[in-house]
């Protein structure tokens, strides 16, 4: 372990290197769980943020992400639809709130945000969700500084833009957008005063070194992303990665635990692929540092545990729903 536990509890770092992270990621599991749980207890209460995700516009994306069924390059048989009307989205947000969610995430299958009627509707949706007393998150691809500013003015809590994988493995997953494009988008979001939601996916054919490299980029962002979604690949027929094998749940536990050690105060979100995890594996993820989940029976194009099953699980675990999200003040972003 590159740092003693006492040192881990004293400081939050932004200078982790890949070798240190690999050493943590490869620790004996029982030691890794102990270290991550100790950090988690120090910096976070045992409560879980419930984020509900809704696909506002599905399919037809111009990017060639090899894991995604919404890409125009995918042969997946998904049900595409144009952008929902504001009223329809607000109805879904109200359902999510009534079920206990405190964040409503809205997804658009776009390469980038484009000005016009659709963007104006997005701004209206953001304002409407905030008026419900919920946090509002958007994921819609790249954006300009002006668009980020307008989203901030509308009250957007967070913008999601994942890195997906390591800089080294990235070219094997997507070629229509560069890694630097993603980092530039994150910088614009941060500089507009919007919280950053940024994570990645495991199970894309990457090595353990790639996972460490992804975590190196995330943990050296200053400040750290407020939310860090950790996804496991859901291999969908018709996508470029349809034949990839499911990851072992221990790999997800290791990724969650390492992310918690590196980014002590971030919301570590147990995201896509959670339905494949056993109840026991999910509990270990919560113990090791996961303190946010996607809540509701559907993500963008994949299934998820139901509201009812998640409430039952959280009650068994003994954690509370999270209502105390900390909004960071506007601060310039550095990489």
Swiss-Prot record:
The keyword Transferase applies. GO terms for molecular function: 2 iron, 2 sulfur cluster binding; 4 iron, 4 sulfur cluster binding; biotin synthase activity; iron ion binding. Gene3D superfamilies: Aldolase class I. Its cofactor is [4Fe-4S] cluster; [2Fe-2S] cluster. [2Fe-2S] cluster binds at residues 105, 137, 197, 269. One of its GO terms (biological process) is biotin biosynthetic process. Binds 1 [4Fe-4S] cluster. The cluster is coordinated with 3 cysteines and an exchangeable S-adenosyl-L-methionine. Its EC number is 2.8.1.6. Pathway: Cofactor biosynthesis; biotin biosynthesis; biotin from 7,8-diaminononanoate: step 2/2. Pfam families: BATS, Radical_SAM. Residues 46-274 form the Radical SAM core domain. [4Fe-4S] cluster binds at residues 61, 65, 68. Keywords: 2Fe-2S, 4Fe-4S, Biotin biosynthesis, Iron, Iron-sulfur, Metal-binding, S-adenosyl-L-methionine, Transferase. InterPro entries: Aldolase_TIM, BATS_dom, Biotin_synth/BioAB, Biotin_synthase, Elp3/MiaA/NifB-like_rSAM, rSAM. It catalyses: (4R,5S)-dethiobiotin + (sulfur carrier)-SH + 2 reduced [2Fe-2S]-[ferredoxin] + 2 S-adenosyl-L-methionine = (sulfur carrier)-H + biotin + 2 5'-deoxyadenosine + 2 L-methionine + 2 oxidized [2Fe-2S]-[ferredoxin]. Homodimer. Belongs to the radical SAM superfamily. Biotin synthase family. Catalyzes the conversion of dethiobiotin (DTB) to biotin by the insertion of a sulfur atom into dethiobiotin via a radical-based mechanism. This is Biotin synthase. The lineage of its organism: Bacteria, Bacillati, Cyanobacteriota, Cyanophyceae, Synechococcales. The gene is bioB.
